[in-house]
Amino acid sequence: IYVEAYGNILIFVCHFTNDRRVINAVISNAKVLFAEDDEFDYTKYTKLINETIAGIDSTFKQLDIGSDGDVSDYKARELKIKDSIGESDGSVDEDSTMDMTEESTDQRMSEISNGIRTIDILGQIIRNYTGKLNAQAKSEIISEMHSVSMRMLNSWNVAFDLFQSEFVEFCIEQAEKEFPGKATEQIAKRAKEFLCVMLTTANYSQIHNVSLALSKETLIPACEETLRKNSGISGKLILLDLKMNCLGRQPVDEAIDLFIALSKVNNIYAAQIVRLIVWQFARRTHISHVVRDKIRQAFNFIPSAFLQSDTNEPETA
């Protein structure tokens, strides 16, 4: 699967087969990916997350969910970005592809590509054959999609932890050249926060990859049964993103309840992922001003310029 051409062929084939041999082969491939890594645990922070969590919370509070009138513009910008890299028409710009041939020396990148494709392939099977797969097969596929994504995510977290010292040193060196006399402690703090923002964004993208692969309304019961029972916080995040950003549902109260529950047990990092899920939903979905304001207040998002001007506007006869 890590060879791009073969991966694309297998994705295509999985549009047309639910053969148990194919499913078993893909699941077996998934189980060896990141086999040395544990699944990412949202209750156990890495050193980088521990050192920057307060700054991350402050950063994501600054996100603006905009107004209902901004939704179309936001979607248009998304399409332009997808067009620019060739995603929308099925091609991919040469600069945005990675060499995943057998000669590639970067085995870790090959494994990441393999993991992403494996999730996509399992998603193709379960979406196309929802009615023909029995409950056990669906549960097995969903569980392995979740497991490989969390092992991959844990691998990223470990890598970011190892990389942070080198990155901070680089930032300090560059800042000293550009801004002599600047406090190194402040530079180091900002550099770590920037790195953690990148990690948190990557974290959400991995959650979204799984929810996108499971994006079929009739899969909701199987997803609920499998992810809520065995997958802890990460399963709840996938379910929330699946409903809000893939299936067009509006479980705003469910999102607020999860955010409050995580905040009460001081799981600030997982709460930030909920905040990102809701931010993405609010930016891409037409909702009433009442619901948008409810989201803004519950998640402490900054007021939009639209609402500020609207409240200051004098009444007309």
Give the positions of each predicted feature.
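Hydrophobic repeat-domain scaffold segments
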Residues: 1-181, 210
